[in-house]
Amino acid sequence: MVREKVKVSTRTLQWRCVESRRDSKRLYYGRFILSPLMKGQADTIGIAMRRALLGEIEGTCITRAKSENIPHDYSNIVGIQESVHEILMNLNEIVLRSNLYGTRNALICVQGPGYITARDIILPPSVEIVDNTQHIATVTESIDLCIGLKIERNRGYSLKMSNNFEDRSYPIDAVFMPVQNANHSIHSYGNGNGKQEILFLEIWTNGSLTPKEALHEASRNLINLFIPFLHVEEETFHLENNQHQVTLPLFPFHNRLVNLRKKKKELAFQYIFIDQLELPPRIYNCLKKSNIHTLLDLLNNSQEDLIKIEHFHIEDVKKILDILEKK
């Protein structure tokens, strides 16, 4: 466990981790402070951060299991101590760590008798298990058991539908929430108009990421939500014919994209593939999945189009522009 004495700065706003510990493979704890804040700011930030930590961070879960030996999810398999329902519940609790996008397949294939744990799951390279000792089932007889698994990355909850069975595959309730709990508290100091606040933020995670990583991702997601309000090229929103529709102004770096198109010849763009741009792997994969293969494909999309791509962030657009301007 790491613990620091809290020293309050009276100058620049800063944050610091003052306590960090690992209680188990599936329980991490971190305590952070942000100071100095003006009166009222700590509560504003604390509420927003807590909601972002609990609802805006993606997690990876097993969402479906399939086996030819399972007639329905409340049946029993000969030679298996647990019911199918209990096995599905155990799979639901497996904690995974990954940066995958989309869906991946995994497999359990064992021969009894013996105990089946998370260690027996054959995973794709992009996924790893946080706690290999998590129990799945007990095989009491000399039988072969194979279970196919589907793994997804998402946020929030995914509740199974009882009638959503596909070819003897069974959906599993998934909780895509790496942060198990988050609390904030406020300490005030000073008098009168000089009164200031310290924000204390406590974060508990399931081990798939650290509290510090969770804080970083939640902060980034909050920034992405607020960026549309930071436009500088237009001061007001313009209502279209439909008064319920609002056209958002362009992003501040829109002119950079326009200037880039003017400087370079579009004829050459179609012969430059995004493979040549040395993009970060995540950005490259997002573009590929959206059928963007060449520089021409890329520049034919506006920045608004790009940020609509799944798992694509606003800062990724700026990063792409920075790379293109160097070419």
Swiss-Prot record:
Q: Outline the segment boundaries, as ranges, of region: Alpha N-terminal domain (alpha-NTD).
A: 1-233
Gene assigned in the entry:
rpoA
EC number, as in UniProt: 2.7.7.6
Q: Which family does it belong to?
A: Belongs to the RNA polymerase alpha chain family.
* Coiled coil feature spans: none
Top-rank taxon, per record: Eukaryota
Q: Which Gene3D superfamilies match?
A: 5' to 3' exonuclease, C-terminal subdomain, DNA-directed RNA polymerase, insert domain, RNA polymerase, RBP11-like subunit
User: Which compartment or compartments is the protein found in?
Assistant: Plastid, Chloroplast
Q: How does it assemble?
A: In plastids the minimal PEP RNA polymerase catalytic core is composed of four subunits: alpha, beta, beta', and beta''. When a (nuclear-encoded) sigma factor is associated with the core the holoenzyme is formed, which can initiate transcription.
Q: One GO biological process from the UniProt record?
A: DNA-templated transcription
What top-tier enzyme class does this entry carry? transferase
Alphabetical UniProt keywords: Chloroplast, DNA-directed RNA polymerase, Nucleotidyltransferase, Plastid, Transcription, Transferase
Q: Which InterPro entries match?
A: DNA-dir_RNA_pol_insert, DNA-dir_RNA_pol_RpoA/D/Rpb3, DNA-dir_RpoA, RBP11-like, RNAP_asu_C, RNApol_insert_sf
Q: What is its main location?
A: plastid
The species is: Draba nemorosa
Region named Alpha C-terminal domain (alpha-CTD): 267-327
Q: What is this protein called?
A: DNA-directed RNA polymerase subunit alpha
Chemical reaction(s) catalysed: RNA(n) + a ribonucleoside 5'-triphosphate = RNA(n+1) + diphosphate
One GO cellular component assignment for this chain's record is:
mitochondrion
